[in-house]
Amino acid sequence: MYHYAGNNPVRYTDPDGCFLEVTDNGDGTYVISGGAVNSDKNIYVVDDSGNRTGILGQMLTENSFFDEGALVIGAIIDTSDASGSEFLGNFENNTPDIFSYINNARNGKIYDFKDLGKGNLKGNELNKYRHRGMQLGIDENGNKIFGSARDVGNYAAGYVAGKSGLYWIEARLGFDAYQSFKSRRFCSEGAATQAAQRLGFTAGQNSSQGKPVTNYRLMRMQMMQYR
């Protein structure tokens, strides 16, 4: 299992968020059935009467299974799905340079994790597929951390930006520029996208490669100020 955030996910997870409710299919998969925005990021298992019977784990970000603030009802969390953790583990060990990433992260490309294997899905079924859930780590208290396929791709985007030595404002401008290009209007990415990107960015910036690059840029800036 890939433990994001340097084997310490609590360092980079968001402190506040939403709660989520799921129903148990009895085969290791859970269907998202309810949820709301508040400070509780727990994923509660509920029975057919809506009574809470346990806690599956916690969400990676406050919006992991929400799309533009709307709960993606019917999306499936598969506790046996290791594809996201494997993707991020490989991405961390074989991080592409930022230009290679940009060329291969567009819709349908190899780094567009949310759409890998989507087939001919469209509309709401495609949206549920993009928000399919999987375990991405375990926090210091032993709680399982679950994220969506969309989270995985956005985390990777932030990671490569942070590891490349970009500042957050630079990365944010790039992400929003691409979103504006796709939307054919000036706009910013949504809260769900930004939250996962920021977690990945922090992890990338604090990686063994990201730290020296960032420190070098800071040193250069300080030198320029004293000229």
Give the predicted meaning of each segment.
Residues 1, 153-157, 193, 199:
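Membrane-active amphipathic alpha-helices enriched in small hydrophobic residues
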Residues 16-17, 159-170, 202-209:
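Catalytic Zn2+-binding segment of zinc metalloproteases
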